[in-house]
């Protein structure tokens, strides 16, 4: 084998730059790390050769990556945000959560899940401050054969009508506002009351936000409800449901929307039913959506 072809001679030549770097990993005793770094090295060198950046452009890229790291802290992960806006987070999620035919699709978890949300009786209202447009959420948890799943744990959370989660507005929203955990009975059905969520921006006051603006992109996520659905014997489902009429439904900043996750948000003009549900405005939003769990 020609050492010049494989890069094993150790000398740097532009035409075989990636091969020279990859050859230095011959003594790596972690095969997975070796595989990953070989692919990353090859693709990065391919990109640099295609782009042919100036030295000034390369230093600008280095400074951007430095700023991304510097803004991270215990509650802010700008690297994840960077991955999100490039669609990489969704791609990793899709690869790791491929579903059998008929099972509900997953999407990214998001940064605002709270592990100790309270378990609530079926039908409870998770909107604790009474603000926003009333909403009734119903549906079933099924297996891929259409059989109801009893004992399914449904962890749900959402932003309020101004686009904020409770953890973003300590002292303004009550703790655990618009969060709750529900457990299905034998019929697999769930229902709860809430407030219609609104679209909101991802954090855009840092380097990732600057990059979005430079690319001519907005920072908004369309209105959605988060779900984690788990049951014994089934794969846990992390997903959302989205309002198809949201202005940002086709341009989610983090690419989290899949067509199967669109739900039907219906405005119900029924004063009697609204009163029965404890809604004071004489009308409400209704959304019915089933989730299908895979084993």
Curated annotation (Swiss-Prot):
Pfam family for this entry, one: Dioxygenase_C
Binding-site residues, Fe cation: 165, 200, 224, 226
Keyword presence, Iron: yes
Family matches, as SUPFAM superfamilies: Aromatic compound dioxygenase
Top-level taxonomic group: Bacteria
One Gene Ontology molecular-function label: ferric iron binding
UniProt remark on cofactor binding: Binds 1 Fe(3+) ion per subunit.
Enzyme class: oxidoreductase
Biological process per Gene Ontology, one example term: catechol-containing compound metabolic process
This protein's pathway: Aromatic compound metabolism
EC code(s) of this entry: 1.13.11.37
Protein name according to UniProt: Hydroxyquinol 1,2-dioxygenase
Origin species: Rhizobium sp. (strain MTP-10005)
């Amino acid at each position: 084998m020609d050492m010049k072809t494989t890069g094993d001679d150790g000398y740097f030549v532009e035409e075989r730059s990636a091969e020279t770097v990859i050859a230095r990993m011959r003594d790596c005793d972690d095969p997975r790390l070796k595989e990953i770094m070989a692919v990353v090295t090859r693709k990065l060198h391919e990109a640099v050769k295609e782009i042919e950046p100036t030295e000034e452009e390369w230093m600008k890229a280095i400074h951007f990556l430095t700023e991304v790291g510097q803004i991270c802290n215990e509650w802010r992960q700008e690297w994840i945000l960077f991955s999100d806006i490039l669609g990489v987070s969704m791609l990793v999620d899709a690869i790791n959560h491929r579903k059998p035919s008929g099972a509900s699709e997953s999407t990214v978890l998001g940064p605002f899940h709270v592990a100790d949300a309270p378990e609530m009786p079926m039908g409870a209202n998770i909107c604790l401050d009474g603000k926003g447009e009333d909403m009734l959420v119903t549906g079933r948890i099924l297996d891929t054969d259409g059989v109801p799943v009893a004992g399914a744990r449904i962890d749900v959370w959402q932003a309020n009508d101004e686009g904020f989660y409770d953890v973003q507005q300590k002292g303004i929203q009550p703790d655990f506002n618009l969060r709750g955990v529900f457990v299905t009975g034998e019929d697999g059905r769930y229902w709860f009351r809430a407030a219609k969520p609104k679209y909101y921006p991802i954090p855009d006051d840092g380097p990732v936000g600057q990059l979005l603006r430079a690319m001519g992109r907005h920072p908004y996520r369309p209105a959605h409800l988060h779900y984690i659905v788990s049951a014994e014997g089934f794969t846990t489902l992390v997903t959302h449901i989205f309002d198809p009429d949201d202005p940002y439904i086709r341009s989610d900043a983090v690419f989290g929307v899949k067509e199967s996750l669109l739900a039907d948000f219906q405005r119900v003009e029924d004063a009697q039913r609204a009163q029965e549900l404890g809604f004071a405005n004489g009308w409400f939003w209704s959304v019915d959506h089933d989730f299908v769990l895979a084993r």
